[in-house]
Every structure is written in structure tokens, then in C-alpha cells.
Amino acid sequence: MRPNQTFKPLTLTIFSAFALSAGTLTFAQNADNDVVQLGNIVVSATGSEQLVEDAPASITVISREDLEKKSYGDVTDMLMDVPGVNITGGGSSSDISIRGMAPAYTMLLIDGRRQNTRETRPNSDNSGIEQGWLPPLQAIERIEVIRGPMSSLYGSDAMGGVVNIITRKVPVEWTGSVRNELTLQEDSDSGNIYSSNLYLGGPIIKDKLGVQIFGQKFYRQEDKILQGFANQDKTSGSIKFAFTPNQDHDITAELARSIQERNTTPGKSSAATDRFGNPNEASNVSYYQTRYALGHVGRWGDLTTDTYLQHSKTDNPSRNMFLKNSEFDTKWSLPLGSHLLTAGFHYQNEKLRDLGNHFGSDIQKLSRYQWALFAEDEWLLTDDFALTGGLRMTRDENYGSHWTPRLYGVWHMTDNLTLKGGVSTGFKAPNLRHSVADWGQATGGAGGNAVIIGNPNLKPEKSFSQELSFLWDSRAGFNAGLTLFNTQFKDKITEERVCDSTGSASCTIIPGGHAFDFISTRFNVDKAVMRGVEATASWQALDNLKFSANYTYTYSRQKSGPFEGRALNKTPKHMINASVDWDPNEDLNLWTRINFRGKTSEYQSRTSMADGTASYAFVDLGVNYKVNRNVDVGLGVYNIFDKRVTNEDYGGTYDGRRYWLQLTANF
């Protein structure tokens, strides 16, 4: 029997000490309290806390200790080393793709709460903004990344995977920190980066009421590189109150405000003229978000409940787009004999006001509600084998009911070897604009005169995935894993041209009578398959020396539609990440890493196939030094060999050699 395989005692300990979501924990435990340590515990795989090796999913955890060692502009930088994850876009449009699925299928969570504002961008799919709403580095306790569909637990948008940002708990004693970072580019055409993060937290009334404050300022100068980084200015802050009336109840109230500004100048990061030869104008775009949240965790004997109410308002005034999202979610978890039962209810309501309808109708407001019931049972059939079954029924105002089941097994074959595997389903409802017949969304880029018409006959996209994992833990510092995955994608929504003007011909919309260069709409036409391999290894060679590496192979093919037999997305076939971490003494840390991205084949880019791109690799090196108990410094050289990756050659722009400096003061 595997050591420490005590399902019910461990479960009871966890549920008596912690909330279902780490972000709603009220006060951090004292170091000498007899509690389960969080180092190997995750919450995203089932909504309940469990050891990583027991979690019914392929999951990667990035600890706070690892996050503090390197330079991060946003969460995309934090995920560079995760197997199966590809950071797409480049420049100011970086986004997160998991196992070959487009970024729109990756769900972003903060403490298990959805963050979805893609509707506030033109065509609802522009990248690079979504992660700007996530907490700053100083606010993060850890990041949990689930690779593969999780719609049975999280609903629509979790078809590709989940990134869950777990924030820090309110401390029992007053503490704080200020972290300042500077990145200087060797190439004067690339913009320098400045950022500052603030954290402050502590008790107002001992053991009853606490407060936590986060703040961030991020600024990047504009590149003088076509399709390079825009001028970016981000300001965000949040305040959270945590109230513990007694040991059985935790109540939180949170307010967060974020502002993102992006500016491009013709002749710098944007083209001097449009495709017709007319001078381009400078682009100044601002996004504003305000988010309110109330949370409650209750412990009622063996039963634990986790409930939250969240409302967010996101504005894109430069494009006259305004989005309101309201959500209510409750989970109930109960260990019962050899079962861990979880059930819950979720409700969300989206309201979009967009003044950019080019169809000629007077429609400006779109809305949709969705509710869901879900249940899971983690059943410990033997001391070494657990089977998790889950089912979610989602009722969408526009698309009716959808059932998303999953079944996953975890077998600890020996003390060292674990076999995991299962099947899961996913679905994603079309975006609000996509299915409205009288909606015409502007497209065609700067100076363009084109429109995409909504299609009321669209169906939700669906997926069916299988995976199998072998995990080896020597219990002496060496870990390795091999995962095989296969995803069948059905009813993919594809954009198609229905009219393309040539010569003196024109495409005219009735009503309105406006002539466009081209008119597109969307259809459910495509089937696709994504499959691959993820291999990982980690070796703690000495107490102060660690080697880590992972490799991902991804294959994708469209099985139907006009591009049958071609690759689906711009995903490298081969990806390799490797790192070395060395602590010569308790105050000094040295690290280096390499990120390799293999070539991509031709891939579908909206209505046509785009050329594949060549391979590239980045090598980084850094050092962190603890000056004293209150001051830390970090130095780094990124892209040591100055590999140039430009939009012209690679379809995205990444920085060349640059130098990083950070100073953190703790108090």
C-alpha cells in the first residue's frame, strides 16, 4: 500500500483547516500549528483540496518561490516553462494556448472565479488583454495549470484547460513588501519596461478581521518595430477584507480596479500607411475594469460549503463597448465513507452594450444568461485506486441544455509509480455577437471596410478528450512523467467569406445599403483532432541543486471543412523547456533556462491558410541575492544569444537581449 494513503483522515483534516478555494482563506495559519502543508496541495482539479499526485487531472503547480526568481510582465511570462502550454501572438498580443487549442478555449480563474472579458474587444477574440486583469506578482501564492478540458467542473470556455491564480491569504501579523523591476533593452528599437508592485496585509481585529491590499504599476515604452510591442501602461489595485466570526465561517469582501492603456504610433509599432496607401492614425485604446466579490466558506461538521457572488464591469470606451458580468457559484463537499462528494450550482449573466454594429440595424445591446448544476464523486475503491466521476448540466438561454461528463482514475501502482487516465468532454457556447443575425462586426484591420455577420444557426463547439499518464517519484529527489493525450474537436466555428468585392463590384448589406470590401460570417463546419505527448523530469541532485526539463509533441489535423488535412492552429510540433537552479548558500540563488519552440506547419488563420514558421530558442540566466532579512535583489540577462524573432518571419515579435534588475523590500 502506498504510504500516507489515508483518504478520509486527510480529507477531514484538509476540510477542517482550509476552504475549498485557497483565495477565500481568511487568515494564514501559524507555522507551528498542526495543519496540512500546502506545498503539494491543489484545488483546481476537483474544486476541493488534494495532493497533486492524487488529483484527477494533468496539473502543474508554479510556486511563489519560483515566481519570485524571474521577470514577469504578466501571467504569460509565468507559464513559459509549463509542458503543453504555448504562448502565442508575441508583441502586445501574447496569449495562452494549451495542448494545441486556441487561447479562447483557456479559462482564466482568480481563486476559482472566472475572468472573461473577451467580449470587450473587436470580434471578441483579440489577444493580449485578458491576462492584464490578473493579479500582480506580489499578490500570487501559486498558479495551478490544468491541461485538458474541465467543462464538467467549470463549464463553457474550459475546453482547452484552466489557469487558476491562487492569491495570498490574509496574514495573522502585519507584513508588506514593495517590488520594483527594470528591464533595459540592448536594442534601442525595443521599449524598456518598468514595474512596481505593492503588498500590505494584516489584522484589524486579532483573529477576527483582517485586510489585504495589492497594487501594481506597469509601463512599457513603444517599440520602433513594425508589429512590435505597443506602449503599455497598466495600473491596478485591490483591497480584500476577511472576517472570521468563529472557526466555522470565513467571509471575504473584495474590490479591484484595473486600467490598461495601449498606444501605437504609425511608423513605430504600427505601419505608417494602411493597405490602400493612406496615412494611418495613432491608436490610443483604454480598458477599464471594476470587480466586486463576496465570498463565504462554511464548515458544518464534515460538510464544507464555498459560495461566492461576483460582479465585474469592463469598458472599452475607445470602441464603445461595455460589458457587465454577474456570477453566483456555490459548492458543497462532503466526505462520506470512501467517497468525497461535491455538488454545486452556478449562474452567470452577461450584458454587452456595443455601439459598433455595422449591419444597419439599431441593435446595440446583447445579453445572455446561463445556469448549471454539477456533481462529482471521488470514490476510493481501494487504498491505492480512486475513481472520479463528474457530470455538469448547463442550461444556456440561447443554446438549451448541454451535458458534460468526465471519468478519471488514479492508481498508485507502487510507492513510486502512479498511473492516471480518463476521458472528459468540453463545450463552448458561441460569443454574444456571433449568433445575432442583425449584427455586423467591423473587421479588415486599420483602414479596412469589411464586416462579419452573425449567424443564429451556430451550435456550441464540443470536444471529447482522453489522456493517460505514468508518473514516477523515486521519493529520493527524482520525478518523471509521461502523458499521452488525444482530443477530438467537433463543430468548430470557422469564419468564411460570403462576398469578396473585385474590380468595381461591391458587397452591399440590406438594410443600410452600405458597400463593403468583403462580408464574412461564421459556420459550424470543422472537425479536428489534436494529440500529443508530454514528458517531464525533475532531479534534486543535491539539497541546493535542481535540474528540470519537459518536452511536448503536438499534432493537429482538420478532419473536415475547406482546409481538411491541414494543421488547425499555429502550434509548434516540438517544445522543450529546461532549467537549472542552484543555491550556493542560503542567501544566493543562480538559475538558467532554455525555451525551445519548434517549427510550425501551415495553419488556419481565419479564412485562409498561413505559412508555417521556423524554430527558435531563448536562453536566460539570472541571480537572486538576499542582502538581509528585509531586502532582496535580482539580476538577469534574457535572450542571452540575442535571437531575433519578428512578426515578418515568425508571425509575432519577441524581445532580443535585455537586462533585468529587481529590488524587493519586505517589512
Predicted regions and their residues:
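Surface-exposed extracellular loop regions of Gram-negative outer-membrane beta-barrel proteins
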Residues: 114, 119, 270-272, 351-353, ...
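N-terminal periplasmic accessory domains that precede
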Residues: 75-78, 94-97, 108-111, 130-133, ...
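Gram-negative outer-membrane beta-barrel transporters
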Residues: 179, 380-387, 486-488, 508-604, ...
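Outer membrane beta-barrel strand-and-loop segments of large Gram-negative receptors
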Residues: 325-334, 338, 344, 366, ...
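Periplasmic-side early beta-strands and strand-to-turn transitions of outer-membrane beta-barrels
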Residues: 171-285
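Conserved C-terminal beta-signal and adjacent last beta-strands/turns
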Residues: 6-7, 13-15, 28, 201-203, ...
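Extracytoplasmic beta-strand/coil segments of soluble accessory domains associated
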Residues: 39, 76-117, 141
